[in-house]
A protein has these predicted regions:
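Bacterial N-terminal signal peptides that target proteins for export
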Residues: 2-12
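Bacterial N-terminal signal peptides
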Residues: 11-20
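Non-catalytic extracellular/lumenal accessory regions of secreted precursors
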Residues: 23-52, 136-153
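Short, surface-exposed binding/anchoring microloops in extracellular/periplasmic proteins
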Residues: 39-77
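Edge beta-strands of jelly-roll/beta-sandwich modules across compartments, strongly enriched
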Residues: 45-47, 76-78, 114, 122-149
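Beta-sandwich interaction modules
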Residues: 53, 98-109
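Noncatalytic modules at the cell exterior or secretory-pathway interfaces
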Residues: 60-62, 107-127
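Short, surface-exposed beta-strand/strand-loop-strand elements in extracellular ectodomains
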Residues: 72-92
C-alpha cells in the first residue's frame, strides 16, 4: 500500500512539474476566429510582442508557428509573419485541421518589439492558434511579453 501511494505521489508530482515547465517555456494564443463573418479575404490580425531578459539570458530571437483548426477548404490557408527591425520571416499551416503546426520560423533581432501578423489566403472563416517564443542564443526560453493587439479586421 505504501509503495502505491509513493508511486502515485511521484506520478502526480511529475505531471505537475511537467505542466509548470510547459507553462513557463511556451506561449500560445487562445483559439482565435480570423474573420468571423467570413467575407473579408484580406482580414488581418496584427500584434506586437517584446522579448526581454527574465534571468534566463539575453534574448536572441523570436520563433513563431501557426496552427489552423478549421476544416480544410480549397485555396484557404492561414499564414503568420514575424517582423523585427530589419528582418522578417513567414510560415503557413499547409494542412488545415490536421492537428499539426506550420514550420517554425525565427527572426534574430535580440530584445525589443517584434510585430506579428496573421492572415488568410481568401474568403472564409479560420480558427487558429499562434505559438511565439523569445529564445536566447543557446535556445533557452527567455522573457516574452503577452501580445498587444494593434489591429483585428
Amino acid at each position: 500500500m505504501k509503495r502505491s501511494v509513493k508511486q502515485l505521489l511521484v506520478t502526480v508530482f511529475s505531471i505537475v512539474t511537467l505542466g509548470y515547465i510547459a507553462s513557463i517555456s511556451a506561449h500560445e494564443s487562445p483559439r482565435v476566429i480570423l474573420d468571423p463573418e467570413g467575407n473579408n479575404p484580406s482580414f488581418l490580425a496584427y500584434a506586437s510582442v517584446s522579448c526581454f531578459d527574465d534571468g534566463n539570458g539575453a534574448p536572441d530571437s523570436m520563433v513563431i508557428s501557426v496552427q489552423d483548426f478549421s476544416a480544410p477548404q480549397a485555396n484557404l490557408l492561414v499564414s503568420a509573419q514575424v517582423i523585427g527591425k530589419f528582418h522578417a520571416a513567414q510560415t503557413t499551416d499547409l494542412v488545415s485541421g490536421d492537428g499539426g503546426y506550420s514550420a517554425e520560423v525565427r527572426v534574430h533581432e535580440g530584445a525589443g518589439p517584434y510585430l506579428l501578423l496573421i492572415n488568410k489566403s481568401g474568403h472564409g472563416t479560420r480558427e487558429f492558434v499562434l505559438t511565439y517564443h523569445c529564445l536566447t542564443i543557446d535556445g533557452i526560453h527567455t522573457g516574452t511579453n503577452d501580445p498587444m493587439v494593434i489591429q483585428f479586421q
